[in-house]
Amino acid sequence: MTLADLKKPTSRATPSTEETFTRVRTPRRENNEILATVESLLGANRLRLRCMDGVVRMGRIPGSMKKKTWIREGDVVIVVPWEFQNEKADVIWKYTRPQVDWLERKGYLKG
């Protein structure tokens, strides 16, 4: 018996016919979370956000997200408005492209 006989056969070029299911995080109303689209990057971890409630807010990327997640113009994010200044918000989640497609199909994103 050789070493080649002991190796498991690999299937490199076989496409999977199974659909992959991913859980998509939706905004939680009890935590005052809102969906928003990034309009522009302002620098110094700040951005201009167009929220789904119709308000344009200045967003802040907290330090816990700064290095891990890169946010660009046009990205869809979840924000939490500040309690004492409604025109400012913290970004807490960024969606990937397949997740944005799912949100559009389910009616979470308007227009």
From Swiss-Prot:
Q: Which residues form the S1-like domain?
A: 22-96
- InterPro entries per the record? NA-bd_OB-fold, RNA-binding_domain_S1_IF1, TIF_eIF-1A, TIF_eIF-1A_CS
**Gene3D superfamilies for this protein:** Nucleic acid-binding proteins (2.40.50.140)
* One annotated GO molecular function: RNA binding
An example Gene Ontology CC term for this record: cytoplasm
Q: Does the keyword Protein biosynthesis apply?
A: yes
Q: State the Gene Ontology BP annotations.
A: translational initiation
Keywords attached to this entry: Initiation factor, Protein biosynthesis
Q: Specify where the region named Disordered lies, as residue ranges.
A: 1-26
Known function: Seems to be required for maximal rate of protein biosynthesis. Enhances ribosome dissociation into subunits and stabilizes the binding of the initiator Met-tRNA(I) to 40 S ribosomal subunits.
To which protein family does this belong? Belongs to the eIF-1A family.
Q: What is this protein called?
A: Translation initiation factor 1A 1
